Amino acid sequence: MTEVRVGIVSWNTSALLDRCLGALSAALDGLDAEIVVVDNASGDDSATVAARHRGVHVVVNRTNEGYARAMNQALADTPAPVLIALNPDTEPPPSSLAKLVERVHERPGAGLVVPRLLNPDGTLQPSVQRFPSLPLALVSGFVPPRWQRGRLGQRWWLEPGAPHDRCEPVDWAIGAVHVLRAGALGGMPPYCERSLMYAEDLELCWRLHRTGWQVWLEADIEIPHVGNAAGQRAWGWQRRHRYWAASYDVVRAVRGSAHARAWAGVNLAATAVHLAANRVGSLTAGPAAARRRHEAAVLRSLLPVHGRVLATGVPRLEAQPPASGLR
């Protein structure tokens, strides 16, 4: 009997995909698993690389269908009670995925479990957050970092390491490694397809919470994750624009247009404050000043993103490929 379906979506990430697939057998530790790789019209040899791995079923899309739609393809039509949405820029250690599947069965209220993510250098990669809200935006945007410690930081998960150092329910988790209970989805596809990429993980976690399921962080299970391999290639630093557009769409759908516009107003003001601080810091010399100048350019580019939502509401998402050739 099939115990788990593993879905991976690749777009021009063949080298990372090869390492990820090479690690799967040991990571699944004997589980009866189906492995499906959906290639989103890559310009590299992702599909060929995937086909070299034994037991991997490869689906090749003629056009880039976006991450959510492609992952839904990968996880569809299976009797498996557990579904794993896995990014190709992860390299799961031996037994890691098997342990996460076991946690799904051990926690009857868990609709989704996720590991603690690590950067390639072994440092913590923050991956779980509070749901977007006006209080969180105010605290994170305007309270000085040195004051985001202790009880305040713990409450809003702003303090480094919190809550990544313990196993507990969380609000939402980025989608690098999602281990899902199929029965928690109510017959629906896992991911919302309104956006080409980004915030589908936020929408899924919100949906699970609203239907009575928990999202669990399993902090004692660690998986390395490069992060934004496809997004960086597609949009560069402008991926932040895509992220914010998709996030506003989800917040509007869940909390309403008025809340989304108010959230945009807080984000706009906070971005302006941070931009001013970065401009001051960029007046010095050295690498730190160069980083601040780059960050200032990014922040400046985000002002109209937040401003448009505040002024006219959340725009209709256009699932268009970027000019760099994502298609």
Give the positions of each predicted feature:
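A conserved acidic beta->alpha catalytic loop
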Residues: 23, 39-47, 63, 93
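Short, acidic, metal-binding catalytic loop of nucleotide-sugar glycosyltransferases
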Residues: 23-32
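Short, flexible, basic/aromatic active-site loop/helix in glycosyltransferases
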Residues: 132-170
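Non-catalytic, C-terminal membrane-associated alpha-helical segments of glycosyltransferases
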Residues: 238-246, 257-327
